């Protein structure tokens, strides 16, 4: 990950005054880093601390249940990196993925479906398999041991009604 600093635009910091006025941008032209000296002490401590969402005691009925994956900060960060890769790096490189969907699309689907941890494991496993000696073809993201085809609720599995081995092969 790289940090890009533009030399064409000056830094902008937010000045917080004690008179409770709205925040006003203040341009600092000669500073090379962000400073928080002008902020009150309690605001400095708030900036240093990370806040976490607390789980409500009464869950909202509209909120996702256990089976549904809510996009976390990690998923959003991973998807942002993948979008950057697809937009900036991938067009420069020759096509080399042997699978459908491509490795970057596979990774995006895995992160959306399984979350950060399982998505990272599946992406790593896919990148290890995507080489000239590996396989090729259709390979959707699915967790280990998970079946590839999910039946709808109303459908039943097809029964084998063949009498002979020869009829099965046809």
Swiss-Prot record:
Residues 154-170 have a biased composition (Acidic residues). It comes from the Eukaryota. InterPro entries: Membr_insert_effic_factor_YidD (IPR002696). Residues 49-70, 147-170 are annotated as: Disordered. NCBIfam families: membrane protein insertion efficiency factor YidD (TIGR00278). Belongs to the UPF0161 family. This is UPF0161 protein At3g09310. It comes from Arabidopsis thaliana.
């Amino acid at each position: 990950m790289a940090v890009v600093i533009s030399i064409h635009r000056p830094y902008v910091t937010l000045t917080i005054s004690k008179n409770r006025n709205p925040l006003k941008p203040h341009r600092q032209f000669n500073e090379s880093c962000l400073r928080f000296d002008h902020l009150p002490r309690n605001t400095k401590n708030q900036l240093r601390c990370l806040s976490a969402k607390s789980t409500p005691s009464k869950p909202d009925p509209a909120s996702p249940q256990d089976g549904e994956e809510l996009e976390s900060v990690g998923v959003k960060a991973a998807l942002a990196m993948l979008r950057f890769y697809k937009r900036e790096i991938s067009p420069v490189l020759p096509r080399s993925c042997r699978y459908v969907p491509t490795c970057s699309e596979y990774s995006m689907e895995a992160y959306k479906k399984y979350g950060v941890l399982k998505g990272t494991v599946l992406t790593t496993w896919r990148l290890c398999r995507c080489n000239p000696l590996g396989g090729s073809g259709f390979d959707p993201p699915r967790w280990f041991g998970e079946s590839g085809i999910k039946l709808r609720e109303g459908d039943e599995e097809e029964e084998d009604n063949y009498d002979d081995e020869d009829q099965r092969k046809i």
